[in-house]
């Protein structure tokens, strides 16, 4: 049994570097073959020759019949079977141990090279000229050989050597030869003994005088052992076939895919290098859009907010509300009488008339805001002052009726007339509105129609009034009247106009 233990230790080392099916096969070999053969079979087959008897007294006839019945003992036959079947596994184990030893040597040499390399780095300038430099050169020639050998088996994360290359081929040959040995020993057992032992064996080999009967001890027990060992051999054969399928197809496909994957990085490295070189070319395009987005949207927003109110009066038709008129502060523009045709339009009015470009989001008109209570109260207070002024104008009209009508056609000094009112709100400067028709008024004595020059003045003032009254829903119509030159006190008129803070003059009437 000492020899069996030595074989068991060797097979245990091989089990560490085997597949799952290979480990199962080794377990079957250990338990159902070696242990059973060493524990029970020798005792059962121990009296094989001593208890073999024949019914003859002829010397030598019994030995000749035993040799014919059992050309080789079953115990020895099974021992040979175990040895032959285990031999391919032992060869594979030897290959693994060789690889392990080569790896250990490689590591030792690499450590030596690292130590020598560190020493050469410290005294590199003198090492190139000294004799030790040649030795260092030889050391530098070793790493390429070692790098080539590192491509052979490599240990996995569990510390086992991976099957690949020559090691994988060795393992496949190991399985194939084990299968062949199993089949050969099963067939040999069938031809040598068969699968059953009969209690009586007839022998007619000389020197026996005639056919003699020989008797075998414990034939039934021996038959059971034969069948048991045959079943174990069949199980081992089945495991070998499964392992051939597992390695012959799966592992070979893995080897092909692994070789293909090892070759692919070499081909894929060139596109990676190309993309790496093209990165500086592709980086500049994203920069210009960033500059455009930061500068473009900033000026658009204030323009839309400033221009949006311009569209409000355009979307709706002009209308006149019957609300109290609003007074205007005095302005410094020239009177209408000093111009033959029409007063000059201020520069800011021309700016309002010119169309201003509006961006796309401004096309939607905004609703006209309703007047607030503060604005309504303001105009109510102004209406009271205007009513007092109208009373004064009525008195002036009565006095004008008493004067001769010829004086009405006299030219009035330009200083009496008020210039064009100054615009209060910036919206009035920007909104050009359609001119209203000429307005006529009838006095108590005579009716006067507005001249062409005054009509143009009314057109301008009508536009200004519409632009002024549109957002607050209130209009103010001004009628020009002529005063008598002698009956009206200019001081009184100027004081009244200043106290009421209105734009009306002695020759104007607000209706």
Swiss-Prot record:
Q: Does the keyword field hold Glycoprotein?
A: no
Those portions of the chain lying inside the lipid bilayer but not traversing it, as listed in its UniProt record, are located at 2-15
* Residue segments, region Disordered: 110-143, 397-511
Biological process GO annotation list?
Answer: cell-cell signaling; gap junction-mediated intercellular transport
Transmembrane region(s): 20-40, 72-92, 175-195, 224-244
Tell whether Phosphoprotein is among the UniProt keywords.
no
Segments in the Cytoplasmic topological domain: 16-19, 93-174, 245-511
The family note in this entry says: Belongs to the connexin family.
Q: What is this protein called?
A: Gap junction alpha-3 protein
UniProt source species: Gallus gallus (Chicken)
């Amino acid at each position: 049994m000492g020899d069996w233990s030595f074989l068991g230790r060797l097979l245990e080392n091989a089990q560490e570097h085997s597949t799952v099916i290979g480990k199962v096969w080794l377990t079957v070999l250990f338990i159902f073959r070696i242990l059973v053969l060493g524990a029970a079979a020798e005792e059962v087959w121990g009296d094989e020759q001593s208890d073999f008897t024949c019914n003859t007294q002829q010397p030598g006839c019994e030995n000749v019949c035993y040799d014919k019945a059992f050309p080789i003992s079953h115990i020895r036959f099974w021992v040979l079977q175990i040895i032959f079947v285990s031999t391919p596994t032992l060869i594979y184990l030897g290959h693994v141990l060789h690889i392990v030893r080569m790896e250990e040597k490689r590591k030792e040499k690499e450590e030596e090279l690292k130590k020598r390399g560190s020493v050469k780095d410290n005294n590199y300038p003198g090492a190139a000229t000294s004799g030790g430099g040649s030795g260092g050169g030889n050391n530098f020639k070793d790493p390429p050989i070692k790098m080539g050998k590192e491509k052979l088996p490599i240990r996995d994360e569990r510390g086992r050597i991976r099957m690949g290359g020559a090691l994988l081929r060795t393992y496949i040959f190991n399985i194939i030869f084990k299968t062949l040995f199993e089949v050969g020993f099963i067939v040999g057992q069938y031809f040598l003994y068969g699968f059953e032992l009969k209690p009586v064996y007839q022998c007619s080999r000389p020197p026996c005088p005639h056919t003699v009967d020989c008797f075998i001890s414990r034939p039934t027990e021996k038959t059971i052992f034969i069948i048991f060992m045959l079943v174990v051999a069949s199980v081992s054969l089945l495991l070998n076939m499964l392992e051939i399928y597992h390695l012959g197809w799966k592992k070979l496909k893995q080897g092909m895919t692994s070789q293909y994957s090892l070759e692919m990085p070499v081909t894929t490295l060139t596109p990676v290098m190309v993309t790496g070189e093209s990165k500086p070319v592709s980086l500049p395009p994203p920069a210009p859009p960033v500059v455009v987005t930061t500068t473009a949207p900033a000026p658009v927003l204030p323009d839309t907010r400033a221009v949006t109110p311009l569209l409000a009066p355009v979307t709706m038709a002009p209308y006149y509300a019957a609300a109290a008129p609003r007074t205007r502060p005095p302005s410094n523009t020239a009177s209408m009488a000093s111009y033959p045709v029409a007063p000059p339009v201020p520069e800011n009015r021309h700016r309002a008339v010119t169309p201003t470009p509006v961006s796309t989001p401004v096309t939607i008109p905004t609703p006209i805001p309703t007047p607030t209570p503060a604005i309504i109260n303001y105009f109510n207070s102004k209406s009271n002052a205007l009513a007092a002024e109208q009373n004064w104008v009525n008195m002036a009209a009565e006095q004008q009726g008493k004067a001769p009508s010829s004086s009405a056609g006299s030219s009035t000094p330009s200083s009496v007339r008020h210039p064009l009112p100054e615009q209060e709100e910036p919206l009035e400067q920007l909104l050009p509105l359609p001119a209203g028709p000429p307005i006529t008024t009838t006095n108590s004595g005579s009716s006067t129609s507005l001249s062409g020059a005054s009509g143009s003045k009314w057109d301008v003032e009508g536009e200004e009034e519409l632009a002024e009254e549109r957002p607050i829903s209130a209009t103010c119509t001004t009628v020009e009247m002529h005063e008598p030159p002698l009956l009206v006190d200019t001081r009184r008129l100027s004081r009244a106009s200043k106290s009421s803070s209105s734009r009306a003059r002695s020759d104007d009437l607000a209706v």
